[in-house]
Regions:
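Nucleic-acid endo/exonuclease domains
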Residues: 1-137
């Protein structure tokens, strides 16, 4: 499949190794719970998990190629300094820059992003996503 990398250059990427296994835990427990939620709506779609961001070492939690939707799940380390994850405040700030690069890459490739924080998993529903993001899943 053709994508633009983070620099805007077109590249080919084989998506087959990243096709979602709905029953396998990859990543955090929260990520698995989000995956199980989307399974009921997306089981017949082309979905990749832990998909590489071309031109970087970053990955996207989920990409629905059928609907052009990316889903990112975030733990508390995403918006709060956690010494175990970040080691220092500089690394914490760098994580924001990486997120910006990732979201720019997703936009460059025509994907809409859904961000779900740990404390929002309990609220997950088709209606909640429509209300919060304006997206039909």
């Amino acid at each position: 499949m053709k994508f633009k990398n983070i620099y805007g250059r077109e590249v080919n990427k084989n998506i087959t190794p990243y096709i979602v296994d709905w029953n396998k835990v990859r990543g955090s427990k929260a990520q698995f719970n989000v995956k199980k939620f989307f399974e009921q709506f997306w089981v017949a779609h082309v979905i990749c998990e832990e998909f590489p961001v071309s031109g970087s070492r970053m990955r996207c939690d989920f990409i629905n190629f059928t609907k052009k939707i990316a889903v990112e799940t975030h733990g508390q380390q995403h918006d709060k300094f956690i010494p175990f994850f970040h080691k220092n405040r500089t690394n914490f700030k760098k994580s924001f820059k990486r997120d910006l690069v990732k979201y720019n890459w997703l936009e460059l490739n025509g994907f809409t992003v859904i961000e779900i924080f740990d404390n929002e998993i309990k609220d997950l529903s088709r209606e909640w996503i429509k209300e919060k993001f304006g997206i039909e899943i």
